[in-house]
Amino acid sequence: MPIFTTPFASLELLRQPHQPNEPLQAFDAADEYLLNHLHEQGLRAEDSLLLLNDSFGALACSLAGRCQVTSSSDSHLGFIALENNLAGNGLNRDAVRFLPSSETPQGPFDWVLIRVPKTLALLEEQLIRLHGQLAPGARVVAAAMVKHLPRAAGDLLEKYIGPVQASLAVKKARLLLATPEAKAAPHSPYPTRYRLDKPALELINHANVFCRDGLDIGTRAFLPHLPRHLDARRVADLGCGNGVLGIAYALGSPQAQLTLVDESYMAVQSARENWAAALGERPATIRAGDGLAEQPAGSLDLVLCNPPFHQQQVVGDFLAWRMFQQARAALVTGGELWIVGNRHLGYHAKLARLFRGVEQVAANPKFVVLKASK
């Protein structure tokens, strides 16, 4: 197991979801650089420290018990990783307060350590929410690997926090040190809103929702082909994003009981608000979760899924494969998984390893819609 060693601790850390023979680590040189800088500057036990986007808990576990630590992230998988890594290293769970990104951190904070996220809209929303939450003399430091650090990240820090100084690169990582200054209360451009014609919906997307400014092209290819012939009462929208697939299915199936689940807290927040706008008080289960890991076996008739092909900056089909396995376990015998995916990802062959039958329902030059029967 990889060991993460800094002046604060030596830790064994795992990613989430954990894969056997995992080639990737739960930390990187940017985490190390941040913690070395914090140690050099001097951390006091009475300091209140906020972590933003600590992917798998490397920062939080290193600082647990050394000051008042709040960790905020948009990833439920990141939250699971934090809990597992605290427990795996014998650390007190109560030493770190976790806050989903759908909630605003309450300061005042003496330190804010930020891992620059892939989606800069998320960073912008997080910086906006820091207004009025910084203690006098607070220090705000962002970090990233150089290859994942766009110039716009520094521009956002300067816009919402204050003047920014970039560090030298160390082990291909860089820090951005922002000096807070008095600023007028900012207006957030999030959530964004857009309209669909079929079905007729007005949808919102909070800052970290995939394809924030409109309907993603995969979902657009999927919507005209949603199953309607099934007597499916128990239906899940797996990796629901803003909930549009589940909502569209529910509008055409008044008796269906819907479960919408995503690992992004902002996606879940968007889905809840969109469901309420489209379907009022009609009951549904809309939750953050590790896919269908918590779903009882044989409890679903139909699963709809537009699977992701990346986790932060890591691209691959491991998340989709895991979701397919979860769907198979949750479906009744005879139940169906319907997905949309890029042609080149070869999902047909992968589904054929898990399901009794796989059919192509529709296709265009870029996407295929597939039906897999258990």
UniProtKB/Swiss-Prot annotation:
One of its GO terms (molecular function) is nucleic acid binding. The keyword Aminoacyl-tRNA synthetase does not apply. It catalyses: guanosine(1835) in 23S rRNA + S-adenosyl-L-methionine = N(2)-methylguanosine(1835) in 23S rRNA + S-adenosyl-L-homocysteine + H(+). It comes from the Bacteria. Its EC number is 2.1.1.174. InterPro entries: DNA_methylase_N6_adenine_CS (IPR002052), rRNA_m2G-MeTrfase_RlmG (IPR017237), RsmC/RlmG (IPR046977), SAM-dependent_MTases_sf (IPR029063), Small_mtfrase_dom (IPR007848). GO terms for cellular component: cytoplasm. SUPFAM superfamilies: S-adenosyl-L-methionine-dependent methyltransferases (SSF53335). Its main location: cytoplasm. Keywords: Cytoplasm, Methyltransferase, rRNA processing, S-adenosyl-L-methionine, Transferase. It is found in: Cytoplasm. Belongs to the methyltransferase superfamily. RlmG family. Specifically methylates the guanine in position 1835 (m2G1835) of 23S rRNA. This is Ribosomal RNA large subunit methyltransferase G. The lineage of its organism: Bacteria, Pseudomonadati, Pseudomonadota, Gammaproteobacteria, Pseudomonadales.
